[in-house]
Amino acid sequence: MKMRKLFAGIAAAATLLGGMALGAASAQADGAATTAGSGTTVTGSAKFKFTAQDAKQLTNRELNAYKIADYVQYGTGNDATYGVQTAGTVTDQSGIKAALEAAVAGTNKTVPTDGGDLMAWALAEGVLDTTESSKDTATGAWKNGASRKFVETLKTRINMLGDPTVVDLGKNLAKDGLSATVTLPAGLYLFVDADYSAGTNKDATPSIAILVGSGNVENGVLNPLAEATVDIKNQTTAVTKKVNGKDAITASVGQKVTYTITSKVPQNTQYYSDYGYTYTDTPSVGQTVDFDSLKVTVADKALTKDTDYTVAKNEDGTFTVTISSIQKQTAGALITVTYAAKVTEAGASGSKAVTNAVVLSDNGAEATDSTTITNSGFSFTKTDAQGNPLAGATFTIRVPGVDGSFTATSDKTGTVTFKGLADGTYEVNETTVPNGFQQSLKAKFNVIIENGEVKFNGTDVWGLAPKESSDKYQVKNVKNVSQLPLTGAAGTTLFTVVALLVAGAGVAVALKSRQRVH
């Protein structure tokens, strides 16, 4: 009866942990065997296959394998059966005892103190079968069931388990990178990520500790040397950053933009004594961050600054947002960090583009994303009717999203330049005409910027701004109406003005004639 319960407990633990496949007997175990009480210890080797959803989970990944139990064969041939006993490499039984006490806490079981083998008792009594202590059997490896309590407690006492065997998963990858297979002596192992406390592997987070046994059970027969398969219990990290909802935008000087950073609360943070989760943001020159606007939400619920998260400005111009409450948040929930910034760079293109990168450090694993802001401008030349450059002409444009207007004045070469403009259509209005020129005749025209390319869109009503767009676009001032163009819309306007003047003169003469008659 005890033996049947032993294997039932082993099989249940195997189901729970996704890799501990043990059970009833087979006489097919090869390799040498040493005497263990009335049985012999199985010393043959077995393979352990670790699988992952993403190759990064296994890349550069090392695990420390602590053997905590041996298989023991009782009998020979077709009558052979198997049990377990604490591994001879364990140096201090009190570590396993403490782990078992954590596992049975709240149950009617008591860890024996009579000197018997603790691992044999644990599996015989079904201690690692969480169906007796937790209803969460489907995902027990990630939850706080009996087996997980056992593993998490034992992980803190690995100094009592003897020297581990280091297995390098990164050097034993399958061609697709989604599995890694290593060979170890048959038995039950606690696998602890070598990077667990340091958190320096940038490819993926450290794995939580895993309890895995070699072998499998088929038709009630145990083969302790069969390959065991287990999912690595870590995850890759991802982060997304947008500016105004996009990867790249154009924005004018003085325009406010909104940055949004998103990621998800990682799994299994509860199994770490300290879990680091930090965004390091690197805004380039050409923008001013509004730190008062920075907000953090998890699942659309606002977090409290200095309680749930902290913000630190660094001397190199970067700043960090640390989610200090990450272990209290719901796994898989969306984390959103938002803040505003004002664009200050008027020549944001090429090497001067305004960039903003974020690096998410998820307990050592890293992910990064970035955004880009560009802007451009346009120039034209102010001339007189003969094409000579004019200084002192002032023009203004209205810029969406920016208070006030942009103003530019022609220099001694007649050049007028507007910088730091987002893509869009701008109406250019002449507001100041140089002295000596007709003050009532002012130019007005449109400029279209698209993907940084500039197109001038004339002609204005006076013909001062030409219709054709070119790199040498010239806008004129005239001293009198006779210098206005005599063709096109401008010519029509001129003749209309002249006609009105003539008509006005005719009316005046007629009125004077009537006055003489009367």
Can you describe what each PLM-predicted range is?
Residues 2-518:
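Solvent-exposed loop/turn and edge beta-strand elements of beta-rich ligand-binding domains
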